[in-house]
A protein has these predicted regions:
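Conserved active-site and cofactor/substrate-binding residues in soluble primary-metabolism enzymes
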Residues: 82, 86, 144, 184
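Glycine-centered small-residue hotspots that permit tight backbone geometry or close packing
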Residues: 11, 35, 91, 109, ...
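Charge-dense, low-complexity intrinsically disordered segments
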Residues: 9, 71-74, 78-82, 136, ...
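Structural beta-alpha unit
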Residues: 14, 40-46, 50-52, 65, ...
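Short secondary-structure transition/capping segments
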Residues: 79-87, 118, 151-156, 204-216
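Gly/Ser-rich helix-loop-strand patches that form or flank binding pockets
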Residues: 14-15, 21, 27-28, 104, ...
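Small/aliphatic-rich secondary-structure junction motif
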Residues: 1-70, 98-100, 171-216
Length: 216
C-alpha cells in the first residue's frame, strides 16, 4: 500500500513521534522510509549582509567584508549540516533497530516550500509529519509549516501527528460527503483498519436548514 514513507524531522516531540509511527507503518507495509530535514543557510547569509552596516569601521573595507562573508557562510553551512545530520541520525537509529531501509535527505531553503517541492517532485506514497515543530506557539493546533505543506501537496497521503503519545487503542473515523475524495479516504481507512486491527467508523454531517435557505 505504501512503498515509500516520507518523514520530515526537526527533533521536536511531534517529529519524534512521527518517526516512531513511520517505522511502525513501514514494518506493516514493507516500506522504505525517507527522512528529511530542511536548513536555511541562505537565509542566514542574507541576514548577515543586512547587519553589515552595523559592523565596526575596520570591517567596512570591501575585501574584509568579503572575507567575513565567506567565513560566516562556511561556519553557518557547516553548523546547520551538523544539526541536520544529528536529526537524521535519530531516524537512522530507529530504522536500523527495526531493519527498515532508510534514505536520508538534507534540503536547503524555506522549510514548507522545500518540503512541498520535494514531496511533489518525488511522489512519496505517504507523508508523516508533526502538527507542531520546535517553533510551536502555545495553544497552537497546527504549525504554519505543516499547514502550508498540506495545502500544497496533492500526490501524497498525509498523516499529521497531533498526539505525542503512542497510537494505541481507539478507532479510525472517516468523514464522507459523497465525493470521490471522501470515498478514497474511506478505502484508505478500511485498509489501515485491517492493517492496525482498528474499527472504522464513517460519519457524515448535513445542515437541515441549508436547502430551505438556498432555495426559498
Amino acid at each position: 500500500m505504501y512503498k515509500t514513507i516520507y518523514v520530515p524531522v526537526d527533533n521536536s516531540d511531534h517529529s519524534n513521534m512521527a518517526v516512531e509511527l513511520g517505522v511502525r507503518f513501514a514494518k506493516i507495509f514493507g516500506s522504505k522510509i525517507v527522512g528529511s530535514h530542511v536548513y536555511a543557510a541562505k537565509m542566514h547569509d542574507k541576514r548577515f549582509k543586512q547587519m553589515e552596516a552595523g559592523l565596526p569601521e575596520e570591517y567596512h573595507d570591501e575585501k574584509e567584508l568579503d572575507r567575513q562573508r565567506q567565513i560566516h557562510d562556511s561556519l553557518i553551512t557547516r553548523g546547520l549540516q551538523i544539526i541536520t545530520d544529528s536529526y537524521l541520525d535519530f531516524v537512522d537509529q530507529k530504522c536500523a533497530e527495526a531493519n527498515i531501509p532508510l534514505e536520508r535527505r538534507s534540503l536547503e531553503g524555506r522549510n514548507w516550500k522545500a518540503l512541498a517541492e520535494d514531496i511533489t517532485k518525488n511522489g512519496y506514497d505517504l507523508t508523516i509529519m508533526g502538527a507542531l515543530g520546535v517553533g510551536a506557539v502555545k495553544d497552537s493546533v497546527i504549525g504554519s509549516n505543516t499547514e502550508r505543506v498540506i495545502r500544497r501537496v496533492r500526490n501524497s497521503d498525509m498523516f499529521i501527528v497531533k498526539d505525542t503519545k503512542p497510537m494505541n487503542g481507539g478507532k479510525i473515523v472517516v468523514a464522507v460527503d459523497g465525493s470521490h475524495y471522501s470515498f478514497g479516504g474511506l478505502k484508505t481507512a478500511l485498509a489501515l483498519g485491517k492493517a492496525f486491527n482498528k474499527p472504522v467508523e464513517a460519519i457524515s454531517a448535513f445542515d437541515p436548514y441549508f436547502h430551505y435557505a438556498a432555495f426559498h
